[in-house]
Swiss-Prot record:
GO terms for cellular component: plasma membrane-derived thylakoid membrane; proton-transporting ATP synthase complex. GO terms for molecular function: ADP binding; ATP binding; proton-transporting ATP synthase activity, rotational mechanism. It comes from Prochlorococcus marinus (strain NATL2A). ATP binds at G170, D171, R172, Q173, T174, G175, K176, T177. Its main location: membrane. The gene is atpA. This is ATP synthase subunit alpha. Signal peptide: none annotated. InterPro entries: ATP_synth_asu-like_sf, ATP_synth_asu_C, ATP_synth_asu_C_sf, ATP_synth_F1_a_nt-bd_dom, ATP_synth_F1_asu, ATPase_a/bsu_AS, ATPase_F1/V1/A1_a/bsu_N, ATPase_F1/V1/A1_a/bsu_N_sf. It is a peripheral membrane protein. Its EC number is 7.1.2.2. F-type ATPases have 2 components, CF(1) - the catalytic core - and CF(0) - the membrane proton channel. CF(1) has five subunits: alpha(3), beta(3), gamma(1), delta(1), epsilon(1). CF(0) has four main subunits: a(1), b(1), b'(1) and c(9-12). Belongs to the ATPase alpha/beta chains family.
Amino acid sequence: MVSIRPDEISSILKQQIADYDKSVSVSNVGTVLQIGDGIARVYGLEKVMAGELVEFEDGTEGIALNLEDDNVGVVLMGEALGVQEGSTVKATGKIASVPVGEAMLGRVVNPLGQQIDGKGEMATTDSRLIESIAPGIIKRKSVHEPMQTGITSIDAMIPIGRGQRELIIGDRQTGKTAIAIDTIINQKGQDVICVYVAVGQKQASVANVVEVLKEKGALDYTIIVNAGASEAAALQYLAPYTGAAIAEHFMYQGKATLVIYDDLTKQAQAYRQMSLLLRRPPGREAYPGDVFYCHSRLLERAAKLSDAMGAGSMTSLPIIETQAGDVSAYIPTNVISITDGQIFLSSDLFNSGLRPAINVGISVSRVGGAAQTKAIKKIAGTLKLELAQFDELAAFSQFASDLDEATQKQLGRGKRLRELLKQPQFDPLNLAEQVAIVYAGVKGLIDEVPEEEVVKFARELRDYLKTNKAEFLKNVLSEKVLSEASESMLKDAISEVKSSMLAA
C-alpha cells in the first residue's frame, strides 16, 4: 500500500495557493432582442456609454447610439450574418478610434482605419478618437495663407485659404470631384497632406481616383478613406469623421492638411437611414433634428491654428450634390450656412462646354480674399465684375438687333475671358501661369485673337513661358508679386505668342 506523506501534500497545496491569481474580469454584457436592417436592439449593457463600441459573438462591431429605458439601440458596422436573437453582446469600454500617422500615406483605408488596398498592415502606433472637439477661439488664427487649387477661375475669383471650409456644390456629373482631385494634384511639392473621403461612391469611381492620383504622383501625400455604396450605413456615416481625425493628427503636428468629403449628401442620407431605423423622430425631408449638428461638428474641426499651437491647418472641401440645381433644399442650405463660401457648379455651363463649370455670379469665398497672393489679387480684381457684366449683356443682347461698338467690344472680351478660364481636367496651373493668363485677358491683350483660338493661345503662352521666359515663372513663384520687370517680360511673351498665332 502506498504511504501518504503529509509534507508532500502540504508543499503542493502551498504551491497551488502561491500560484493562485484572484484577478476578476468583469464584462458588461447584453442579449440581442431584435436584429434587422443594420440595427440591433439589445437588452442589458447597463453601463454602456453613448457612442461606445460593442462587440457581438461573431466579432462584428457596433456603436451604441440609442440609450433607452429598457434596451440599447446599436448600429452594426458590417454584415453581422452570425448575429441572431439571443446572441451575446459585450461592451468594449472604448469609443471608436482610428490609427493615425505617416505610415497611412498612400494607403486606402475603411472608416475604422483598416487597410483595404491589399498592401499589408500599416505600422502605426498612434491612434485618435474619431470624434473630437474642434479647436476653440484662442487656439485659432485668422486664415491668411493661400491654398492654391491650380484652377484659374477659383484661385483668381473665389480664392481659398489654409484653414478655410469651402463648399463645392452642384448637380451630379458637373465636375465636383474633378475640382477636388485637381486641388490634391496641385499640392505636389507644397508640403500639404491630403485626405480624400469617399462616401457612398461606386468602387470603380474610387479605384479610378486612386489610379489618377498614383499616375500624377499625388498618392504619396494622400490618404483615402473609403466607405462604398455597398457598406453599412454606420460606416458611411463615420467615414467623414475618420478623415477629419486622420488630418487632425497632422494639423496638431504643425502641418498643413486638406480634407475632401465626397460627398456629405450621402453621409446625411446614411444618417437619416440609421436614425429612422432607430425610431428617432423625423424632421424636414425626414432627416433627424440633429443633422445640422452632424455636419457642423465635422466642419468646425477645420482650422488654422495659432502659432502657440504649432500653426498647423486643416482645410475642408465638403461636396454636396443638388437635385436640379435646387440649393434651397435642407442639406444644401445647412452646409452653405456652416461653410466659409461655396463654389457653385452649373449643369447648363457644363453642357455648354465651359469646364470647370463654375457659376462665378453666385460662388463666393468669405475669408479667402485675405489669403490670396498679391500677384493674382492685383490683376484679378476686376475679373469677377467683368464676367458678371458680360453675363448681363449677353442676356440683354439676345433681344437687341443692333449693338453699339462699345457693347460689342465688351461682349467680345467677355467671351474671350470665358474661353481663357477653360481648363482640362487633371492639369492644374501654377501661380505664375495663372497670373500670365488672367493678365492677358483682363488687360485686353487678346482682343484681336479669334474667340475659337483663345484656348490654343493660353496653351501656347504657357509653353512659351516655360521655354523662353523661365525667369518670369521663377520670379513670380518666389516673390508672389508681379514686379515691373516681370510685367514687361510677360508683355513681351504675350505679344510674341500673339503675333506668331495671327501670322499663321
